[in-house]
Amino acid sequence: LTEINYPFNVKIKLVKPYDGAWMILHNENGHAALGAVEYMGNSILKTQDAYYKETGKRLEGMAQCLGNYITYYYPYGRGEMFNLFSVITDKPEESGVMCQWKKFELMSPLTKMVYSSDQSRFNYSNVKLIDGEASWGAVCLSDGVLFQSPAAMKLYKANIAADLGDNIRIKYASKAGFGAILYDEVGHRFCFYQNQSRSTTGDPNRFNPTNENPSSYRINPVPKRDNNVTDVDVNNLPVEQKVLWVGAGYEFDPNNSRGFYANSVSIKGLDSCFVYEFNMDGMVSTVDGHPAFAGYYKLKLPEGMDENSCFASTMSYSGILFYTVGNVVYRLDFKQSGGKATPVYTHAGGKATMMKFAKKAKINTNYLDFTNYEFDPNRSLGIVFDMGNGKCDFVV
């Protein structure tokens, strides 16, 4: 009314698109869609299909998996590490490394990520996992075959130690520190792959198998250490146990990238549960005197746990796993005498089908800035609930 302008002090924060967002690959109307949940101060921004919003195009294939991987990648810049984001559908020509701050530009298509001599072993329609948690490389599962990436999301078929034989099929895998914990369903045994540093380059178009996939780096049996737990042979598991999951767990030495535990859960019939604990420093080295197989916990089967349960663990919690039964999330304190299962969240109907912690890596660094997220990623658990009729809920 007075036509007098008054200055106000304001504070503006510029953020990259989808920086610190939860990305959710799902199917709708017969094709994949890339959903996003972003945190903007006290507000939450939900996008049903961020890929379509940014590109004006729909993904054509069906969803397979997402991947994130901290590595060198020259297309983004030299001398720094970046968090590569991969979107995988059953159409390889549209899958691969995407840049979320460049409108999901396809930087490296999946067809060019796999080393040419290994492409015959890579099943593009059955990619279950791309996991680069922690540091030192990533692993990928394609139709039971383990592929490894030393840098820049280049994928090589992992070599296999001779004493494991040729007939192995990796059902579960998880990066943890310098290595990856694996479960071979044919041999009914645990194995590990060592992703330690090697001569490589951040150029996604330059493959050098001699340096990047040397025969000295291979899938190995769990090593025998004098201080290993001896209650069970992890290289020859009891036939009555059924392994349900493996995952990276507590980081016992935050100053050591090898300082991760890895966990696995198996069940026997309807009465028993077993939690395995592996020390990844002991897996790859004898210098610090750690065991490779560090713990074996025999528990009464926790309430409701079965083959349909989802599992998750994180570097922040020692001796704790999370699992689901229907629409309920439980915390399992497996180091308590006999184990203790505590319900921590009950959803309004539906059934949990996927569960994962946001991040299992060091934060507050120049290449992992989660300040926009405003929460500790290592304590942020995302759960997908199937609500029926093609609908799902996502809860953090």
Question: Where do the PLM segments sit?
Answer:
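Entry beta-strands of beta-propeller and related beta-repeat scaffolds
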Residues: 18-23, 83-85, 259-264, 317-321, ...
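Short loop/turn segments immediately following the C-termini of beta-strands
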Residues: 27, 39, 88-92, 141-143, ...
